[in-house]
Design a protein with these regions (language model features):
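Solvent-exposed soluble domains appended to multi-pass membrane proteins
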Residues: 1-212
Length: 212
């Protein structure tokens, strides 16, 4: 797909994107069987963290109906941390999540968490405390996104739940690059997937795959 709602819908609930429709919107919200609901049925506690306000794309209602126990959004964050209409910046989102995940881990119940970042989406905002090396704003924001993830992973490594956690990094969709040759630019469908966890042997897999 070409929008965040497409990627979230397909990745979490294993349904193909309906290109001209946001499947998460509607007066009646369907209940899907997907990763959050299956994990919940097997004893997991599910959390969702987003940078922006919770009703964007009807996310709050949709995800609460479909397996998530807690949702954290712009309404939960201090006003001084709001950077623009997309809410807080990535590094603060990750920083905010750590103590909440620690609290969940202390309960002894396994948990599944989605952290939906925003930095690599225009309008780009580079925090004053981050000093990029690149000249172009498009490259600077990638540096910032990378730095934010590194900062989160460094802090996560200090937590007791780290060794028993599988981290999955995936994009919601690709980005338009160059001059498209098709009605649906192929670059929109080039989405990276990374898995990181204790005991996983480093390797690159080049097989074709999809979010569903």
């Amino acid at each position: 797909g070409i929008h965040t709602n497409h990627g979230m819908y397909s990745t979490l609930y294993s349904f193909p994107t309906i290109m001209k429709r946001n499947a998460m919107k509607g007066s009646v919200i369907p209940v899907y069987s997907g990763l959050p609901t299956v994990l919940k049925d097997n004893g997991y506690y599910n959390l969702f963290f987003m940078t922006h306000e919770s009703q964007y794309d009807n996310m709050n209602a949709f995800f609460r109906t479909n397996g998530f126990d807690e949702i954290y959004a712009e309404e939960n964050y201090p006003k001084e941390k709001i950077a623009n209409h997309f809410g807080v910046q990535d590094d603060y989102l990750y920083e905010y999540a750590i103590p909440i995940l620690n609290e969940r881990a202390q309960s002894g119940q396994p948990f599944f968490t989605v952290l939906l970042s925003i930095s690599n989406h225009p309008p780009y905002v580079i925090p004053s405390y981050f000093h990029p090396k690149s000249d172009k704003i498009e490259d600077q924001i990638v540096e910032y996104a990378d730095w934010s993830i590194r900062k989160f992973m460094t802090e996560a490594q200090k937590q007791p739940w780290f060794d028993n956690t599988l981290f999955i990094l995936i994009g919601d969709h690709g980005k338009l690059v160059g001059t498209p040759e098709n009605e649906m630019p192929e670059s929109y469908n080039h989405v990276p997937l990374m898995m990181y966890g204790k005991g996983i042997t480093p390797q690159a897999i080049n097989d074709f795959g999809g979010q569903i």
